[in-house]
Curated annotation (Swiss-Prot):
The lineage of its organism: Eukaryota, Fungi, Dikarya, Ascomycota, Saccharomycotina. Belongs to the eukaryotic ribosomal protein eL32 family. The gene is RPL32. This is Large ribosomal subunit protein eL32. PANTHER family: 60S RIBOSOMAL PROTEIN L32 AND DNA-DIRECTED RNA POLYMERASE II, SUBUNIT N, RIBOSOMAL PROTEIN L32. It is found in: Cytoplasm. Component of the ribosome, a large ribonucleoprotein complex responsible for the synthesis of proteins in the cell. The small ribosomal subunit (SSU) binds messenger RNAs (mRNAs) and translates the encoded message by selecting cognate aminoacyl-transfer RNA (tRNA) molecules. The large subunit (LSU) contains the ribosomal catalytic site termed the peptidyl transferase center (PTC), which catalyzes the formation of peptide bonds, thereby polymerizing the amino acids delivered by tRNAs into a polypeptide chain. Component of the large ribosomal subunit. Mature ribosomes consist of a small (40S) and a large (60S) subunit. The 40S subunit contains about 32 different proteins and 1 molecule of RNA (18S). The 60S subunit contains 45 different proteins and 3 molecules of RNA (25S, 5.8S and 5S).
């Protein structure tokens, strides 16, 4: 099994979700983030004590942006043929088996990935041990 490409330390700067202003106060206001646009809005004017707003400073390092904790980019695999794409990229990409794949096909995908030297992020998911 190939190890991942060397990279800087992965830092997720803000792991909480940005909540919409007054979503905690009114049930009709969903938590999904919306930018405040009112002329008198204290959130838009960035007053002290208001909720944090998403901005470019919260962004991740470009080199580590889409990496999982093991240091791989994830590629969604739905059948055995999809693994052939990863043959030349075993150090930078890891296969993740889609949730819609049956347990019988999962076994085949994991076996082929092992043969090709491709890392699978969820090899034990949905496996039927009785079959």
């Amino acid at each position: 099994m190939a190890t991942s490409v060397p990279h800087p330390k992965i830092v997720k700067k803000y792991t909480k979700k940005f909540k919409r202003h007054h979503s905690d106060r009114y049930h009709r206001v969903a938590e999904n983030w919306r930018k405040q646009k009112g002329i008198d809005s204290c959130v838009r004017r960035r007053f002290r004590g208001t909720i944090p707003q998403p901005n470019i400073g919260y962004g991740s390092n470009k080199k580590t942006k889409f990496l999982n904790p093991a240091g791989y980019k994830v590629y969604l695999v739905k059948n055995v043929k999809d693994l052939d794409v990863l043959l030349l990229h075993t150090k930078s990409y890891a296969a993740e088996i889609a949730s819609s794949v049956s347990s019988r096909k999962r076994v085949e995908i994991v076996a082929k990935a092992k043969k090709l030297g491709v890392k699978v992020t969820n090899p034990k998911g949905k496996l039927n041990l009785e079959a």
